[in-house]
Structure formats: structure tokens, C-alpha cells
Amino acid sequence: MAIEHDVVSFLTSAGRKLATAESCTGGLIASALASVPGSGGCLDVGFVAYSPSGKGGFLGVREETMERYGLTSEEVAREMAEGALAAQGCTADVAVSNTGVADSLGDGQGPPAGTQCFAWSWRLKDGRCVTFSETQRFSGSRNEIRQAAAQYALSRIEHYSRLPGPRRE
């Protein structure tokens, strides 16, 4: 069974709803889940915020965070995931985010091609969030990297749900 089927099954059985906040993956995470029958019961909302203004305006990522750490950083990914959960109308209690670079900028500056930052955030019953983040590096063509990043983001949802924070209701 493909990971997206596993995630839909896991979220549905856990009674959880998911929000996505995507940059480099450009909606691939939400699209993978939406391809699974029954995903409407666990996929709440998906944001694609590619630009700094989109990350700030829709997800509440602070300009100072983007300037200090760069757009491809765990700090930005964390604020994206937490911002998705805080967005008006969002009823999700789990969010996954991705920001990264799929190909080289060519100037030798910034993170290497394939660098992807992720965050997974859980809204607790008391309103607080617990958030985990990682950085990974994938190889391949631009779209192979984006696909790998989307699959990786999905593959870690159940892992992080088992840690002490998300289990605390």
C-alpha cells in the first residue's frame, strides 16, 4: 500500500484532520492524500505559499525568521506548520509543512540543491502546539526531488504522532 493510503488510514482511525503548508512541493502532499478515496474525512486544508509574502501573509511566518534563517530552514518550516493550524477556518489538529530548494540557484549561495526542510505540528486540546522538524537532502531531477520530499513528509506523520507531545491530549 502506498504511503498516502497509510496516512489516510492512520489519520482517519485516529480521528485527526490534516493541514498542509507547502512551498517547494507545491501542493504535492495535499494532492497525494486527495488521490485516496475517503481522504475528505481527514484532509482539512492545503496551503501553497511559494513566495516570502505568501508565507508571511497566509501562514504568519515572520519576516525576521525568513531573513535570519533563510527560506530553506527548519525555523521557517516550523512557523509554516504552526501558521497553518492557526489559520482562520482551519479545523485540523495536525499540520505538515515543507520548504526547500529542488535545484541549484547557480550562484553557489544558499543551500545545496535537494535540501528540504519539514515540520510536523500537533494542536493539543489546551490550544498549544507541539512541533517537530527535520532537514533532509534528496537527489534527482527537480520533480523527483519534489516527489521524494512529498512522500517523506507523509511518511513521518505517524512516527511523530507516537512521541510524547502529540499523544498528550
Residue ranges, per PLM feature:
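Short alpha-helical segments enriched in small residues
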Residues: 1-169
